[in-house]
Curated annotation (Swiss-Prot):
Posttranslational mods: C-terminal thiocarboxylation occurs in 2 steps, it is first acyl-adenylated (-COAMP) via the hesA/moeB/thiF part of UBA4, then thiocarboxylated (-COSH) via the rhodanese domain of UBA4.
Pfam families found in the cross-reference section: Urm1
Alphabetically ordered keywords of this record: Cytoplasm, Isopeptide bond, tRNA processing, Ubl conjugation pathway
Function: Acts as a sulfur carrier required for 2-thiolation of mcm(5)S(2)U at tRNA wobble positions of cytosolic tRNA(Lys), tRNA(Glu) and tRNA(Gln). Serves as sulfur donor in tRNA 2-thiolation reaction by being thiocarboxylated (-COSH) at its C-terminus by the MOCS3 homolog UBA4. The sulfur is then transferred to tRNA to form 2-thiolation of mcm(5)S(2)U. Prior mcm(5) tRNA modification by the elongator complex is required for 2-thiolation. Also acts as a ubiquitin-like protein (UBL) that is covalently conjugated via an isopeptide bond to lysine residues of target proteins such as AHP1.
Primary localisation category: cytoplasm
Residue(s) carrying 1-thioglycine: 97
Organism for this UniProt entry: Schizosaccharomyces pombe (strain 972 / ATCC 24843) (Fission yeast)
SUPFAM superfamilies: MoaD/ThiS
Name this protein carries in UniProt: Ubiquitin-related modifier 1
Subcellular location: Cytoplasm
Domain of life: Eukaryota
Pathway the protein contributes to: tRNA modification; 5-methoxycarbonylmethyl-2-thiouridine-tRNA biosynthesis
């Protein structure tokens, strides 16, 4: 079962400049959205930048998470069960100025 992940707002820089990924749910070990977040944190190109994506075991404040264009806060956050064909978008609102 495959899902699509998009990385916007500069998050692609943490993932070797990949703006979109196609992932198999079987690689995550669980269908929970929290498992996807853990997996994404593990594949960050530079481990020293992990805290730019994850903080205290979840997505850092300032990163919007959408599942099929719905805010994850409406979908049980980390407990949401991903399904075949889901599209998960991570959008960073964090930036310098």
């Amino acid at each position: 079962m495959a899902i699509k992940v998009e990385l916007l707002g500069g998050l692609d820089l943490l993932f070797n400049k990949q703006k979109a990924l196609s992932l198999s749910l079987s690689n995550l070990g669980s269908t929970k959205l929290g498992s996807l977040i853990d997996y994404m944190a593990q594949i960050i190109e530079k481990p020293s930048q992990k805290d730019l994506f994850i903080l205290n075991g979840t997505v850092r404040p300032g990163i919007i998470v959408l599942v099929n264009d719905q805010d994850w806060e409406l979908l049980e956050k980390e407990e949401y069960n991903l399904e075949e064909g889901d599209e998960v978008v991570f959008v960073s609102t964090l930036h310098g100025g």
